[in-house]
């Protein structure tokens, strides 16, 4: 593993973490909470609790090796014996699942941008113009993904510019929401009615609760990436940075949910979206408050934020499979660099995986939801979050394994006991939510839909691709071992 020079002070990295986690993931999923009426607050605090537990876990395990990159994969190598097949399988799956989470999130950005511009007159309700918007948005993000394979990177000044635009839009969203609430303040009463939604009786099932939980968890995702950056930070207390950043993000989200709770939300109805003060998406907030000009301001701001992240996404994610290839869990061709020092094979593999996944998760939800951009964005958020939550469970088990091996993770026994209880609670709740999300029919009320099949198929296929590559390397590994065995002499 490469050893890095320190690039961030504590304060710089604290701002970096808050900016990395808090953002459009929150405003693209926050309104989905109000499908559950007053239970939205229960889900918000439950998601925040699990996020805090995850933060504590990553903060604890990040102290294992502060000087090398690798993240959860590196920790799994230290916790398990790579000479045993079952342990190698766990180590590989930890690294591979971390890789495939990014392609599963790939459709969110284009869907989110399209949902921002769909409110322009002449688009919504017009099939031809809708398809033009879809084609333009998808092609644009396809081009961004291609450009990101060229090693494009953003310097600190440019990142600061994009961050400034992003936060200007985020804060404007809260201010504009207050203006809309002032015009029509019925949202607080309707959104907190357990029985009646905006237009019909609420249908709250365990499947619906799990879906909203996992969808909203997207707004807190990022700890798995941040924890791999310990070599870049000049600090002796990485744990403090993560906890302070969580508190900052939580407070921002709490204020945001408190404000959004006053909006007349129509997430349960397909009729009259965006009319008469009824809010189906954040784009509707701007359109109702300031018309086309405000809507364009929001759309352009969201676009700038997405461009800044998408330009480096392929390169960043390709780095996740490098250690797997270097350790012979994946074909070594992925670890080969060209004359310019770029790992082109890993980059193009990541590009192909991302584009195929983005295409499927972009078009299928749109078509099956009758081109409901908001619902499609929420679905795209949920499937990526599901893979991320699986990653968190793997990290919890890594910590349990390290404790079993009596690794020096804790200085005080009470801290170890308390965190073990919290991590156990985290595993239980995440497993429960994943179970009802992946198999919602087990609650006896939710009907199986095409999107449920799509989730299992897409995630399952990506896992099978990884296992096929892993088994190929295992076969080569065993063949190589056999070649080293000296044959017995014939007498």
From Swiss-Prot:
Pfam family, one: AA_permease_2
Membrane topology: Multi-pass membrane protein
GO molecular function, one term: transmembrane transporter activity
Disulfide bonds: none
Protein location: Cell membrane
Gene Ontology, cellular component aspect: plasma membrane
Keywords on record: Cell membrane, Membrane, Transmembrane, Transmembrane helix
InterPro entries reported for this sequence: AA/rel_permease1 (IPR002293), APC_superfamily (IPR050367)
TM annotation in the entry: 13-33, 39-59, 89-109, 127-147, 161-181, 203-223, 241-261, 288-308, 347-367, 380-400, 422-442, 452-472
PANTHER family reported in the protein's UniProt record: AMINO ACID TRANSPORTER-RELATED, ARGININE_AGMATINE ANTIPORTER
Family that this chain belongs to: To M.genitalium MG226.
Protein name stated in the entry: Uncharacterized protein MG225 homolog
Species, as recorded: Mycoplasma pneumoniae (strain ATCC 29342 / M129 / Subtype 1)
Organismal lineage: Bacteria, Bacillati, Mycoplasmatota, Mycoplasmoidales, Mycoplasmoidaceae
